[in-house]
């Protein structure tokens, strides 16, 4: 009579665990916002100079593709990153507000923008903490903190802890994820 080893299923278990670890390290592109919880959210409006209630923006991938450029769609909906120094706002010094290119939510003020030397527009803080969401991003075997738009859940960029005073933070954004509105317009 053959003895069955208690380790017989071990190779299969190791393969399953390895697959979970490997594929768990790659965040899947969100694309559609159909999973977003619709409803009113409290956000800051630069135009109003205070907090307002706003509805979340929920669209299908097809709807997003109709209103965004291919580059904007890749960055906002598929968590892409534009090439360093290729974005129109990397070296911009004009005064105004940077909004989400997907839904128009106010995100950053030019007064909080600084030259980080990275090739992407960088800010020390958002216009209001309520206007963004941060979450862990472990894609490509890196540990980062992703920044997304609170209203449409579009990927904006990442935040790092190597920024200047007073916050010590560097909100490194993609130009294609932003829309600039000059002061007085």
Description of each model-found segment:
Residues 3-8:
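N-terminal export leaders
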Residues 26-28:
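Bacterial signal peptide processing site
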Residues 39-60:
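Short, contiguous pre-domain boundary segments
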